[in-house]
Amino acid sequence: MTLEEKASLCSGKDFWHLKSIERLGLPEIMVCDGPHGLRKQNAENKKVGIGNSYPATCFPTAVTTACSWDRELIYKMGQALAEECLQHGVSVLLGPGV
């Protein structure tokens, strides 16, 4: 990768997408946040913050799941988050809080 290509991965295309690098066959990547689940904003909502987001599961807070000491349950939560990301075309989830 060139220095410019590396830098483009740090800054992104917009709030929610990393630029593609066609020369290397790297597709555009969508990222979303959400400490308690997936928070993907509607395409029309171009402002960061509370707005029109697609409905998604709101999982218990990180401190609550940590207090359960139930690794299997937390693993299943990760699987559910992965399924929601796949359904919404999200490649990277910036969460959950751990």
Model region roles, listed by residue range:
Residues 1-98:
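N-terminal beta-rich core of secreted/periplasmic extracellular enzymes
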